Amino acid sequence: MLSFNQNRNHSLEQSLKEGYAQMADLNLSLATEAFPIECEACDCNESHLISNSKNE
């Protein structure tokens, strides 16, 4: 009985680890999709501001 419980606990622990790893991967991919758009816009605005200040 003890060995069954240990195996069960190990399986649950392994499932949790895999689940957390999948959630982390999903969060990373969502963040990667969301933030480059903002960064590109920021870069565009920044280069526009720099070119305006050079022209003045």
Swiss-Prot record:
Query: Which terms under GO biological process does the entry name?
Result: regulation of DNA-templated transcription
Keywords annotated in UniProt? Toxin-antitoxin system
Say if the entry is tagged with keyword Heme. Answer: no
InterPro entries on file:
Arc_rbn_hlx_hlx (IPR013321), MazE (IPR048242)
The answer to keyword Endoplasmic reticulum applying to this record is: no
Would you identify the family this protein belongs to, as annotated?
Belongs to the MazE/EndoAI family.
What is the annotated quaternary arrangement, including any partners? Answer: Forms a complex with cognate toxin MazF which inhibits the endoribonuclease activity of MazF.
Role noted for this protein: Antitoxin component of a type II toxin-antitoxin (TA) system. Labile antitoxin that binds to cognate MazF toxin and counteracts its endoribonuclease activity.
Q: Which protein, by its recorded name, is this?
A: Antitoxin MazE
